[in-house]
Design a protein with these regions (language model features):
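Active-site regions of enzymes building and remodeling cell-envelope glycoconjugates
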Residues: 1, 16-22, 113-122, 209-212
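Phosphate/diphosphate ligand-binding glycine-rich loop within oxidoreductases
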Residues: 1-56
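Short, hydrophobic beta-strand segments that form beta-sheet elements in well-ordered domains
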Residues: 1-4, 99-106, 185-188
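Short glycine-/small-residue-rich Rossmann-like dinucleotide-binding loops
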Residues: 7, 130, 135-138, 163-164, ...
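Mid-domain beta-loop-alpha active-site segment that forms a flexible
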Residues: 32-40, 44, 86, 224-236
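Rossmann-like dinucleotide/phosphate-binding beta-alpha-beta segment
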Residues: 67-156
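Rossmann-like dinucleotide-binding domain for NAD(H)/NADP(H)
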Residues: 156-158, 163-246
Length: 246
């Protein structure tokens, strides 16, 4: 049995001949109570808007001139969410509470939320938004769905990816981070994380020059959420083994 306390599966090689997939199940009702990742996304958006990347003082940065760190507010901003899944729906609640107008785009036309405005294309969502949040599940169909063209629409905007690195054309992303006219970018995920993200060294070489925040896939890494998901997995495994023995 393979049990994984994650929402993504691209770290499990289910094509491996040694792994016999009998069934694949997600405990989505339980996951609705797990808030670590949406809280991280919300925190990243505030960090970008308020220029925390450069405003945190340290031994190396003693600049007390607040005018150089002047930022923006969530109140009155337009937030665009790509993917109205579990995390997307929670984010709608968070940003509404702070006075933002929330837009969303999802290929599933049945998904809706009274607190957000549906947009009919990804391009229109990006154009309508001040902050663009990528929050889709990774599937082979989503591989590289964000290309150089979509990235070019982010000029003058903030962008957050906590989905998976593989949903982006990362070569185009690196080029855009170096040359684009965006306001800020936050990345919690990169491709090939298990083997060491190939893009990481290049990003770290330039992130200090831009309003770019990189976190090591810590979206779900809180004591509370990890404890609850790990306990849930043990509980479900025990139930499965008990049924097999019966």
């Amino acid at each position: 049995y393979i049990c994984s306390p994650t929402t993504g599966l691209n770290h499990i090689d289910i094509s491996n001949d040694e792994i016999k997939v009998i069934s694949l199940k997600g405990d989505y009702a339980f996951l609705n109570s797990i808030r670590a990742t949406p809280e991280h996304i919300f925190g990243l958006s505030i960090a970008l808007l308020r220029n925390y990347h450069s405003a945190f003082l340290s031994k190396e940065n003693r600049n007390w001139n607040r005018d150089e760190y002047r930022g923006e507010e969530l109140q009155g901003s337009n937030v665009g969410i790509i993917g109205l899944g579990r995390i997307g729906k929670i984010l709608v609640q968070y940003y509404n509470a702070f006075g933002s107008t929330v837009y969303y785009y999802d290929i599933d036309k049945e998904k809706e939320d009274d607190g957000a405005i549906r947009v009919d294309s990804m391009d229109n969502l990006i154009n309508a938004s001040d902050i663009v949040i990528l929050s889709i599940n990774y599937t082979p169909e989503n591989d590289g769905i964000i290309t150089k063209r979509e990235l070019s629409l982010l000029d003058g905007k903030y962008f957050i990816n906590t989905s998976r690195g593989e949903v982006l054309d990362e070569c185009a992303l690196l080029e855009y981070i170096q040359t684009g006219n965006y306001k800020g970018i936050a990345l919690d995920v990169l491709s090939n994380e298990a083997d060491g993200p190939a893009l990481l060294d290049d990003l770290l070489a330039i992130e200090h020059k831009k309003n770019v925040i990189i976190t090591p896939h810590i979206g779900g890494a809180t004591f509370q959420s990890m404890r609850r998901t790990e306990e849930r997995i043990v509980e479900k495994l025990k139930e499965t083994l008990a049924r097999k023995e019966a």
